Structure formats: structure tokens, C-alpha cells
């Protein structure tokens, strides 16, 4: 809310006391836009490289300029690169492992035999038909203040001084590790019914304020007519 203070003195010109701090409202402005990182419902998919995070983690993504971005959107694909395969986002950006390196496989790897445990550790089914750890883990990072992340579009965020530096799960022993579920995606945490109710309440408040302004204008007009 924007206000203008029109009374700053405690007495009038004749020395009589009067209340201070009288303000006139001038309207409203946007103070901040915040992002809610509440856990969304997990939806099962048929995508072999779809992932959903249960917990506070963010997937780590390498952007075209070499910087690291963070996202909760785990809709990934296995893309073909010059020497083999690379786990990538839908936009073609590389998904990073827990060491901050792109997750790649050479051309001899049968990527249909890959599997993943609940911590994002990547396994490859061997000749014995059993999964074996590859030593690579899908990277997940947490932040002391996720609300301080900078939104850069397409569900991507960048770390800022307000968010703090990324804390890598599996390296920072003080963190509670997130669960990374394969063949699931996280749905929006927005409750459509609640948002509709809030919108109706806001609309009603706007209508009431509009009517109050109209009534005030009519009263002033009547006062002007009485003077004339």
C-alpha cells in the first residue's frame, strides 16, 4: 500500500493537540513475487528417463553458456551426441551428475539396460542380467533459501546471493537426501480450487472499492451542487 502522511505535527496553529500520522491512501504496488516450492503430487509416466524429486532437491543442468541452472522438472531424454549418448533436458541441455559433469555414455552402451535407484544412482544391467552400479549419480542440489533463486524461464533457476550457494546432495553430509523416482514426474502444487476462491475474493474486494470510489465521487458532486 502507498500512503502520504499529511499530519506530522502534534499541535495545530493554536497550540491545541491533534493526532499525528494521518495518512491518505494513494493505491497499491507490487512488493514482491515469490515462488512456492511445495511438494507436488508425483504422476507415473511411461518415460524411461522421466524423474521426479521427493524432497528439497533440484536437478542440476548445464546451460549453453556453461553456467549451472537448477530445476524440479525431470522430463529428460537420452540424446545422441558426437561420441555416444547424453542425458539431456527437452531443450537439449546436459543433465549433470553429483560431481558437476554431464552424464554421458559411450556409443557401445545399451542405454535400454540402464536403471536407477531412489538416490539417482545409475546402474547398467550386465551379462548376468543383474544391475551393476556405474559410479555415476544424477546430481541434486539444495539451497538454504530456495525463495531467493532467480527465475530465468522454462522452470529453470539460478543461484543468487539471496539463495546461497548450491549444496550438493551426497557431498554435504548435513543434508537430508531427496528421493529421485524414475518414470515419475512432479505435478504442479497449485490447488486450482483454492486459487479460484482467492480470485473471486479479490474480484469482490475490487468491486467494493470501485463502488466506494463511485459513492465518494457522487457525494462530492452533491456537495459542490449545494455550494452553487
What are these regions (language model features)?
Residues 1-228:
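Amphipathic alpha-helical polymerization modules
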Amino acid at each position: 500500500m502507498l500512503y502520504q502522511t499529511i499530519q506530522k505535527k502534534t499541535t495545530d496553529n493554536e497550540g491545541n493537540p491533534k493526532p499525528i500520522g494521518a495518512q491518505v491512501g494513494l493505491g497499491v504496488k507490487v512488493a514482491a513475487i515469490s515462488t512456492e516450492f511445495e511438494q507436488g503430487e508425483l504422476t507415473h509416466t511411461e518415460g524411461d528417463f522421466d524423474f521426479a524429486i521427493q524432497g528439497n532437491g533440484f536437478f542440476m543442468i548445464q546451460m549453453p553458456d556453461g553456467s549451472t541452472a537448477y530445476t524440479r522438472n525431470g522430463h529428460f531424454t537420452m540424446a545422441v551426441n558426437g561420441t555416444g549418448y547424453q542425458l539431456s533436458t527437452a531443450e537439449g541441455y546436459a543433465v549433470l551428475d553429483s560431481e558437476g559433469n554431464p552424464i554421458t555414455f559411450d556409443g557401445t552402451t545399451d542405454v535400454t539396460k540402464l536403471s536407477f535407484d531412489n538416490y539417482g544412482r545409475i546402474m547398467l544391467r550386465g551379462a548376468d542380467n543383474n544391475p551393476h552400479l556405474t559410479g555415476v549419480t544424477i546430481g541434486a542440489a539444495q539451497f538454504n533459501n530456495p525463495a531467493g533463486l532467480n527465475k530465468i524461464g522454462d522452470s529453470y533457476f539460478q543461484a543468487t546471493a539471496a539463495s546461497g550457494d548450491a549444496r550438493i546432495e551426497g557431498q554435504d553430509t548435513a543434508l537430508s537426501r531427496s528421493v529421485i523416482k524414475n518414470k515419475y514426474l512432479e505435478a504442479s502444487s497449485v490447488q486450482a480450487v483454492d486459487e479460484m476462491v482467492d480470485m473471486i475474493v479479490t474480484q469482490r474486494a475490487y468491486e467494493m472499492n470501485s463502488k466506494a470510489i463511485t459513492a465518494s465521487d457522487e457525494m462530492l458532486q452533491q456537495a459542490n451542487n449545494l455550494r452553487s
